[in-house]
Regions:
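Acidic/polar low-complexity segments with low predicted structural confidence
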Residues: 1-111
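Helical mechanochemical/support elements of P-loop NTPase systems and associated helical scaffolds
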Residues: 80, 84, 113, 128, ...
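Von Willebrand factor
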Residues: 108-167, 170-212, 217-221, ...
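A generic secondary-structure signal
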Residues: 138-142, 194-201, 229
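VWA/integrin I-like adhesion module and closely mimicked acidic/polar interface patches used
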Residues: 215-259, 265-267
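C-terminal helix of von Willebrand factor
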Residues: 256-282
């Protein structure tokens, strides 16, 4: 703490960036602690920096194109081929074409809607919250102009932290997550319903729900039929499982992913989340 906040109210951005680079989980955990500091100046500064620093740190390096199939379509700038029909249409509007009037076609990935569903039951501190923040940051880093991102937290109730049609930058949800306070019980079925409601509002044809949970629900309906119905409606339900030594918890996560027709990834550390997200959405 002293390395990144050498004096009251001060925050060393360079030291904090170094901490995130050296250890994403520890650096994010430190940033969360700073965002909940008693010093209001330090707290506000940490929350201001959170999205700006965690999202780039959570980006998967070496991944040239985010996951998903690609198709040929209009692209900005110079693409692989001149779109002659679209360019001639511009010529019909104005006899004097400029470089900016040329229309190109290239490979682009169709838009996709991703809804991150966060288990916020119990005390939302420590590793679960750190993992949730890193996961949201990884998704924000992957969200392109044609994509949609929603974030929902649940315990005995469900709270939409970012609606799927939110015009704000995806990274803005990080600040809302830092202020998250959860509850004691776990209504996974209710959380799934809220996430699927957001998926139903999406414009993208491809829709994925990613559930970050230990799989242990102790309130509400059975979530498996809800996940199965989602898969039948072409919305896949994936699970990022917070690793647990309890066989029952691991089995619950396995069953949920299978019912939702999605992928299952076990996370031992928050730093594993970006790569897990990339595998799920490839």
């Amino acid at each position: 703490m002293e390395q990144v906040s050498p004096e009251v109210g001060a925050l060393d951005e360079e030291a904090l960036a170094g901490a995130l680079h050296d250890d994403l989980e520890e650096g994010t955990s430190l940033l969360i602690d700073l965002s909940r500091a008693t010093d209001p100046g330090l707290r506000d500064r940490a929350r201001l920096l959170a999205a700006r620093m965690v999202v780039p740190a959570a980006r998967v390096t070496g991944e040239a194109v985010p996951g998903g199939s690609v198709r040929l379509g209009p692209v900005p700038g110079e693409g692989v081929d001149l779109d002659l029909d679209a360019t001639l249409a511009r010529l019909a509007e104005s006899p004097h074409l400029e470089v900016g009037d040329l229309r190109w076609r290239g490979w682009r990935r169709p838009g996709r809607a991703v809804i991150l569903l966060i288990d916020a039951s119990g005390s939302v501190t420590g590793r679960p919250l750190t993992t949730a923040v890193v996961t949201a940051a990884a998704l924000a880093a992957r969200t392109g102009s044609d994509d949609e991102l929603a974030v929902v937290a649940f315990w005995s109730q469900a709270v939409v932290l970012r609606p799927v049609r939110d015009p704000a930058p995806p990274a803005a949800v990080i600040d809302r997550m830092l202020a998250l306070r959860g509850g004691d019980t776990t209504d996974l079925a209710g959380g799934l319903r809220a996430a699927l409601a957001q998926a139903g509002l999406a414009s993208a044809l491809r829709r994925d729900v990613i559930v970050l949970t230990d799989g242990m629900a102790n309130e509400g309906d059975d979530p498996l039929p809800i996940a199965s119905a989602a898969a039948a409606a072409r919305t896949r339900v994936h699970v990022l499982a917070l690793s647990s030594a309890e066989p029952e918890a691991r089995e619950a996560c396995t069953r949920l992913a299978a019912a939702g027709g999605g992928c299952l990834e076990f996370l031992d550390t928050a730093a594993q989340a970006p790569a897990a997200v990339a595998r799920i959405l490839r």
